[in-house]
């Protein structure tokens, strides 16, 4: 069975390639697109600190939930033949981790505004998507950790760039039918085209 195949030990090069590839080349927001909803739902006039708070919280949640979800899948679901419950188990795990993350992150970084991020974190499908990809490709724990960290950092980068782009076009005279979601989708599409320039980098 595919689930019982041995996973080769990754090298440091594999780790770095997985990190860079997921953050820039196979960006979960622009290329897949997973996690696009919190990107579009983020306040257009959001403060820089709040954008960084959302990016950091998403990165931490993706890393922790993907690693724990992988351990849960390999250690519990596969040995007991419960692979059909993987989506339910991962979804429950992702939701349950949001509250502890929003409890401990403000204590560790009191300067960042983490309040009110629950809906945006709950709507991020990147965690489930990454776990489904990992289970289908038989990825090891270290590779999955690098991919989840890269996916979170990639989301953080796109979120910051998208917020800057929103701030720049907010003062422009945009026709009424294009205001709001239409111009946001066009902006995200242009960013996706720009990120195609990273395709020349090595991929995993």
Model region roles, listed by residue range:
Residues 14-30, 80-94, 145-158:
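Structural signature of hydrophobic alpha-helical transmembrane segments
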Residues 71-120:
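Ordered, amphipathic secondary-structure segments that act as subunit-interaction surfaces
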Residues 156-171:
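Transmembrane alpha-helical segments of integral membrane proteins
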Residues 56-67, 116-132, 155, 180-192:
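Small-residue-rich segments of transmembrane alpha-helices in multi-pass membrane proteins
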Residues 33-41, 102-106, 117, 125-140:
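Generic transmembrane alpha-helix signature in multi-pass membrane proteins
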Residues 47-60, 84-90, 110-122, 177-182:
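Cytoplasmic-side transmembrane-helix entry/capping segments in multi-pass membrane proteins
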Residues 193-204:
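Juxtamembrane boundary at the C-terminal end of a transmembrane helix
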Residues 167-186:
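Interfacial loop-to-transmembrane junctions
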